[in-house]
Design a protein with these regions (language model features):
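Sequence-specific dsDNA recognition surfaces
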Residues: 41-60, 75-103
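Short aromatic-glycine-enriched beta-strand elements
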Residues: 68
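A short beta-sheet element
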Residues: 73, 93-152
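Alpha-helix initiation and N-capping motif
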Residues: 41-44, 127, 145, 158
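Specificity-determining recognition surfaces
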Residues: 154-160
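Non-catalytic DNA-recognition/assembly elements of restriction-modification systems
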Residues: 1-58
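Intrinsically disordered, low-complexity boundary segments flanking structured domains
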Residues: 4-5, 55-62, 74, 120-123
Length: 160
């Protein structure tokens, strides 16, 4: 059983919510922890060159690499071996070139099992991935990509 003490100051900004599941949520507790950190806080959107999500599309699969480009579903991004044997048609992939993964991106699953964070290395290059990934292109001039990945992978980043 979870218990906590709340006061009216925590109820008023939250639309007068009295249900305990809201106030005992780990995201709310971690958010309060972050509010009390003495360091400068910046928005995730201000640390990146680009953050984007792909459009929904129907997939046309082919049997071999000669006629296709390697395809990754969201659940494939956390696998040790990402060579799934699935290939998206090269004709279709021309229209979806913006979904081709690049090295040093951070991808976050946003459908199914949400919140899985993956840092793309050279093995991810030239793989086209599902629209169910938030793609973050880090800007090292604002924050080092390793720090951003570490934060997003932590319990604090997960609750954002």
């Amino acid at each position: 059983m979870k218990t906590s003490v709340i006061n009216t100051k925590s109820i008023l900004p939250n639309s007068f919510r009295f249900d305990p599941s809201f106030h005992l949520s780990e995201a709310i507790i971690l958010g309060k922890d972050l509010d009390n950190v003495p360091y400068e806080k910046i928005s995730i959107k201000d640390t990146n060159s680009k953050v984007f999500l792909g459009n929904i599309f129907s997939r046309i699969f082919v049997k071999d690499k000669e006629h296709g480009i390697p395809y990754l579903a969201a659940s494939d991004t956390v696998l040790a071996d990402i060579n799934t044997g699935r290939f998206l048609s090269k004709k279709q992939s021309k229209e979806l070139a913006y979904l081709i993964l690049k090295k040093d991106w951070i991808v976050i699953t946003c459908s199914g099992t949400i919140g899985n964070v993956t840092y793309t290395n050279s093995t991810f290059e030239n793989h086209i991935a599902t629209h169910d990934l938030i793609r973050i292109v880090p800007n090292d001039e604002k924050i080092l990509k390793g720090y951003l990945y570490a934060f997003l992978s932590s319990k604090y980043g997960y609750c954002q």
